[in-house]
Amino acid sequence: MRTEWIKKRMNDKTRTQMYYAKKGIITEEMEYVAKEENLDPELVRSEVARGRLIIPANINHKHLKPMAIGRVSKTKVNSNIGASALASDIEEEVRKLETSVKYGADTVMDLSAGAKNMDEIREAIIAASPVPIGTVPMYQIIDEIGDVLELTYDDILRVLEKQAKQGVSYFTIHAGLLLRHMPEIAKRKMGIVSRGGSLTASWMLKHHKENPFYTIFDDILDICKEYDVSLSLGDSLRPGCLYDASDKAQLEELKVLGELTLRAWDKDVQVMIEGPGHVPINEIERNVRLEQIYCHEAPFYVLGPLVLDIGAGYDHIGSAIGAAMAAWYGVSMLCYVTPKEHLGLPNEEDVREGMLAYKIAAHSADIARKIPGARDKDDEMSDARYKFDWKKQFELALDPERAKEYHDETLPQEVFKEAEFCSMCGPKFCSYKVTQDAMENFDWDEFKKEAEEKMKAEANN
């Protein structure tokens, strides 16, 4: 799709979406996004220029379909996939990608860690993906050098450059964790639960040096600028339990992420901010508001948040509750959580369950936000239900296969696709049918006449 668009810009010194937006140029990617989101192209351009909307679109991911993350656009959902040292392979990861996209993933992160063939896995995922692919480069850095304590600045830049050339559209970089935050971490119940953050912290504590990603942040920006890789500024100190939510460690890092955001914007690099995590319902709004203040309204991208800690096996449900609220308060993208969260590596079915839970959360928030067209399918579904149009109901459902499967468990015969009831109420107790029959046989003219006569009689008394 984007081959010709990118070819036209080959001789431009800078080719990031933010650069063009600041110059007043509406790119083809912005036009595409505007059409998909039912927005004015000029609004898209101005929001990208301001940093409140990002279009993650590496110039080397040429078959990518552009999408937008920001408050003027629909709430987006990210799916995490990736191989580990103990499970999964290229074919499995591509199937997870396809399942993610099938059920509505707007972006996908390849979080492969410890796998033997990470480059090949990523190449296969990008080649098969119509959506932006994100990574946490630290995982491959450690995989290549073997020991995080041996990490050098050159190791970081080498892997970032390699992944950027492959077509990765956004990097999660844990650059906001600083040495001065370490005393606050000791006060926590669960310390650092971010993988990238914990690895970075171990290097810092061993060498008594500042965060290497923070130290060479300008060099990282140069790579991002060359390939138009967006930055997803990682929250190393996101709370891993309700006890640690909204503590000083989390909020102090958030302020640093705001400073890094301004530095990235100065180099025309797009930014979004990663957020928690585990947050009680009553603290979600405050977390969103603080991000908007500290990070200058850069799009907020949150993991959940989980609103309880005892939902093991059902964390996709507990976190979808927090996700819907977070999106309503102002979060732009939700990172899904699967039923396997805290328990193991998700399989293809777990990806499906997590994606659908989060599409429900995102869609619910968009309806509440009155996003143009967000409720159209819901209204169509209401019409189809009242008309007993079962095939239309299946078609409109977020998961048509599951909707049909549940219906057919008790009424599998094709004749029941025309029935004016389901197995819940049967033919005699269906409220839709009872109401329709009552309305159809009701004499409205007679009712109106009786009502008018009653009103006259009451007036005379």
UniProtKB/Swiss-Prot annotation:
Positions that bind Zn(2+): H278, H342
Co-factor binding details: Binds 1 [4Fe-4S] cluster per subunit. The cluster is coordinated with 3 cysteines and an exchangeable S-adenosyl-L-methionine.
Cofactor(s) the protein needs: [4Fe-4S] cluster
EC primary class: lyase
Ligand binding ([4Fe-4S] cluster): C422, C425, C430
Any matching Pfam family: ThiC_Rad_SAM
An example molecular function term from Gene Ontology annotations: zinc ion binding
InterPro entries per the UniProt record, alphabetical: ThiC, ThiC/Bza_core_dom, ThiC/BzaA/B
GO biological process, one term: thiamine diphosphate biosynthetic process
Binding site for substrate: N80, M109, Y139, H174, S194, R195, G196, D235, S236, L237, R238, E274, Y301
Pathway in which the depicted protein is active: Cofactor biosynthesis; thiamine diphosphate biosynthesis
Known catalytic reactions: 5-amino-1-(5-phospho-beta-D-ribosyl)imidazole + S-adenosyl-L-methionine = 4-amino-2-methyl-5-(phosphooxymethyl)pyrimidine + CO + 5'-deoxyadenosine + formate + L-methionine + 3 H(+)
Family (UniProt): Belongs to the ThiC family.
Family annotation (NCBIfam families): PRK09284.1, PRK13352.1, thiC
HAMAP family from the UniProt entry: ThiC
Official protein name in the record: Phosphomethylpyrimidine synthase
Native organism: Nautilia profundicola (strain ATCC BAA-1463 / DSM 18972 / AmH)
Source taxonomy: Bacteria, Pseudomonadati, Campylobacterota, Epsilonproteobacteria, Nautiliales
